[in-house]
C-alpha cells in the first residue's frame, strides 16, 4: 500500500494528499513526518528531508507535490480532464508561487528571530517581495480560476484553494490579504469534498 509522508501544515503536502484522495488511490496510508528536525523516517526515503513524499508498495519514493499529483492522476479510474492543459498548469503554477512565498516568509522569520510570529523579516527587501507575491498572486488567482468545479478536482483548483487556505492559516490577522470573492466561493463550494475536508491544515 502507498504511504504518504506529510505534516499537518505544509501546503505542498496538502496538494499531494488532496490529489491522492480525489483520484481515489486505493489503500493509501498517511504518516506524519517532522521535516524541521531531520526525521529519520523521512530522510530514509527522501534525502532532501522534504514533505510530501509518497512511498509505493515496492519502496519507490516519489517526492514533490506536482509529481505525486501526476502519479495520482495516472492511477485514477477517472483521470481529471484537462490536467495537462496549459491553462490548468498556468493557474496551478501561480498558486504554487503563492504557497512558496508564504512558506519562505515563515522560514525568513524563523531565521531572523526564531519566531514565526515575529514580523521583522517582512519589512526586509526579500520579505516585501514575498508579500507582493502573495498579494498579487491571490488577486490573479481570483481573476483566473474556474469557479465551477467539476466531478474531479483539477490541479488548478486543488492548488488555488490550498494557497488561499494556507495564507489564511499562517497570516490570520493580516490586513494585506486581498479580497478573493470568486476563489472564496470556490473554496466554499468544494469544502465538503473529501480531498479538502480530510486534508484541512491545522497548527
Predicted regions span which residues?
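GST-like domain detector, emphasizing the conserved glutathione-binding G-site
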Residues: 1-121
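Non-transmembrane alpha-helical segments in soluble domains
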Residues: 69, 73, 89-92, 138, ...
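Surface-exposed helix-capping loop/turn segments at secondary-structure junctions
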Residues: 78, 143-152, 194-200
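GST-like fold's C-terminal all-alpha helical module
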Residues: 95-185
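Short coil/turn segments at secondary-structure boundaries
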Residues: 107, 200-203
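C-terminal end-helix/capping segment
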Residues: 178-199
Amino acid at each position: 500500500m502507498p504511504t504518504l509522508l506529510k505534516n499537518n501544515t505544509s501546503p505542498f503536502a496538502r496538494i499531494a494528499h488532496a490529489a491522492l484522495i480525489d483520484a481515489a488511490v486505493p489503500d493509501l496510508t498517511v504518516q506524519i513526518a517532522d521535516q524541521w528536525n531531520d526525521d529519520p523516517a523521512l530522510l530514509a526515503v527522501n534525502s532532501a528531508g522534504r514533505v510530501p513524499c509518497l512511498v509505493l508498495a515496492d519502496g519507490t519514493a516519489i517526492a514533490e507535490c506536482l509529481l505525486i499529483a501526476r502519479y495520482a492522476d495516472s492511477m485514477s479510474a477517472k483521470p481529471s480532464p484537462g490536467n495537462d492543459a496549459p491553462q490548468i498548469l498556468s493557474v496551478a503554477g501561480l498558486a504554487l508561487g503563492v504557497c512558496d512565498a508564504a512558506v519562505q516568509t515563515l522560514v525568513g522569520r524563523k531565521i531572523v528571530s526564531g519566531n514565526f510570529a515575529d514580523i521583522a523579516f517582512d519589512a526586509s527587501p526579500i520579505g516585501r517581495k514575498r508579500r507582493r507575491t502573495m498579494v498579487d498572486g491571490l488577486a490573479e488567482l481570483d481573476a483566473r480560476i474556474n469557479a465551477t468545479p467539476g466531478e474531479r478536482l483539477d490541479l488548478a483548483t486543488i492548488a488555488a484553494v490550498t494557497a488561499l487556505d494556507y495564507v489564511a492559516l499562517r497570516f490570520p490577522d493580516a490586513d494585506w490579504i486581498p479580497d478573493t470573492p470568486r476563489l472564496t466561493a470556490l473554496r466554499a463550494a468544494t469544502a465538503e469534498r473529501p480531498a479538502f475536508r480530510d486534508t484541512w491544515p491545522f497548527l
